Swiss-Prot record:
Comp. bias intervals (Polar residues): 1-15
Protein name in UniProt: Small ribosomal subunit protein uS5
Organism lineage string: Bacteria, Bacillati, Cyanobacteriota, Cyanophyceae, Synechococcales
Quaternary structure (record): Part of the 30S ribosomal subunit. Contacts proteins S4 and S8.
Gene name, Swiss-Prot/TrEMBL: rpsE
Family to which the UniProt record says this protein belongs: Belongs to the universal ribosomal protein uS5 family.
Keywords linked to the UniProt accession: Ribonucleoprotein, Ribosomal protein, RNA-binding, rRNA-binding
Any one GO BP annotation for this protein: translation
Domain notes: The N-terminal domain interacts with the head of the 30S subunit; the C-terminal domain interacts with the body and contacts protein S4. The interaction surface between S4 and S5 is involved in control of translational fidelity.
GO terms assigned for molecular function: rRNA binding; structural constituent of ribosome
Function: With S4 and S12 plays an important role in translational accuracy.
Keyword rRNA-binding: yes
Signal peptide: none
Residues covered by the S5 DRBM domain: 50-113
Organism: Prochlorococcus marinus (strain MIT 9215)
UniProt xrefs under PROSITE patterns: RIBOSOMAL_S5 (PS00585), S5_DSRBD (PS50881)
Amino acid sequence: MTDTPTKQETQSNKDNVPGAIPVEQKKNNRNDRKRNRRGDSKNLERDSDWQERVVQIRRVSKTVKGGKKMSFRAIVVVGNEKGQVGVGVGKAGDVIGAVRKGVSDGKKNLVRVPLTPNNSIPTLSKGRDGAANVLIRPAAPGTGVIAGGSIRTVLELAGIKNVLAKRLGSKTPLNNARAAMVALSQLRTHKSASRERGISLEQLYS
């Protein structure tokens, strides 16, 4: 009568096989894969918070020794509608590559915008880029975004719901978008303004 091997003996024999992966290592690998899946899902949730809008796509050329080299330039506005917005420019041989580079460039140049409880801006602000001048001022609830072109796109993706904007000077989309970014970057809350000036809020309003 032969003795049948127990489960522990069978498992130990499997572990002793050359090239076999131990049970503990298999469990650790399984746990690592689960953690990676959780991390990927969190990254997808973070990416889903961001929105991107293409303001302009142009076909541009560069004169080189062998002739003209054609490429595409994309102006992209990136924002999470929660007070963060950025403007990026991307160039590539195809449209998809140019947009992808524009999104990456926009996320590198983000600006934090202080929003009021009415989803407006705290104070009036001006911005300039090149020959473009942009004036933005707060508005009452229910006003909406009174702006046009690339300025409207920047304000909407920043999360501003009630604002008045005026474009002065150049009409180019890139300069106007950058001028709006300059105006938003200069915004300060009343508390931060009083702190920078070294006065109280009562003195600021008086």
